[in-house]
C-alpha cells in the first residue's frame, strides 16, 4: 500500500475516534489500564489477579507464527485472552503511522485505537522522551485491549 493511502486510512481512523463516543470511552479505559514497566521495576504485584492464577494453566503458552497480520491472527481466537506483540518504536508513538509508514506498529495503529492510547502526555513523559535520550533503554509498555 502506498504512503498516501496509509495516511488516508489513518486519518479515517482518527476521525472515527474523534466522533465516536464508544471509541473515546475505549481509549479512556485502555489508557487508564496502561502500565509502563521500566527496566529495573519489580513486576510482581503489578497485576495481582494474574499472579494469583499463575498456575491455572495445564499447558504452557503456545507461540504460533503465521503469515497472517497481527490483528487478523488474534481475531482467530474469539473468547480467548490473546496478546498481540507490538514491535514498537521507542521514540515515536505509532512509529511513522501519521506519515504513512507501513511497518507492523503502524499497521496496528492504523486500524485500531492503539495510537491514541500511546500518544498521551504520560507516555511521552515516562516512555518516549526518556527513550530519545537513552543509549539502550529497556522498558515494557502494556496497553489493555482496545478495539
Predicted regions and their residues:
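Conserved small/polar residues in nucleotide/adenosyl-binding loops
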Residues: 142-147
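Conserved N-terminal structural segment that caps and organizes enzyme catalytic cores in eukaryotes
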Residues: 1-141
Amino acid at each position: 500500500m502506498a504512503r498516501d493511502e496509509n495516511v488516508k486510512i489513518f486519518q479515517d481512523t482518527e476521525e472515527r475516534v474523534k466522533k465516536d463516543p464508544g471509541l473515546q470511552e475505549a481509549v479512556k479505559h485502555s489508557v487508564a489500564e496502561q502500565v509502563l514497566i521500566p527496566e529495573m521495576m519489580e513486576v510482581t504485584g503489578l497485576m495481582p489477579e494474574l499472579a494469583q492464577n499463575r498456575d491455572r494453566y495445564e499447558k504452557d503458552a503456545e507461540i504460533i507464527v503465521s503469515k497472517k497480520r497481527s490483528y487478523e491472527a488474534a481475531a482467530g481466537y474469539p473468547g480467548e485472552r490473546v496478546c498481540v506483540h507490538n514491535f514498537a518504536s521507542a521514540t515515536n508513538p505509532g512509529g511513522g503511522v501519521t506519515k504513512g509508514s507501513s511497518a507492523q506498529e503502524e499497521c496496528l495503529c492504523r486500524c485500531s485505537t492503539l495510537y491514541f492510547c500511546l500518544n498521551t502526555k504520560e507516555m511521552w513523559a515516562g516512555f518516549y522522551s526518556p527513550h530519545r535520550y537513552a543509549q539502550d533503554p529497556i522498558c515494557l509498555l502494556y496497553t489493555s485491549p482496545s478495539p
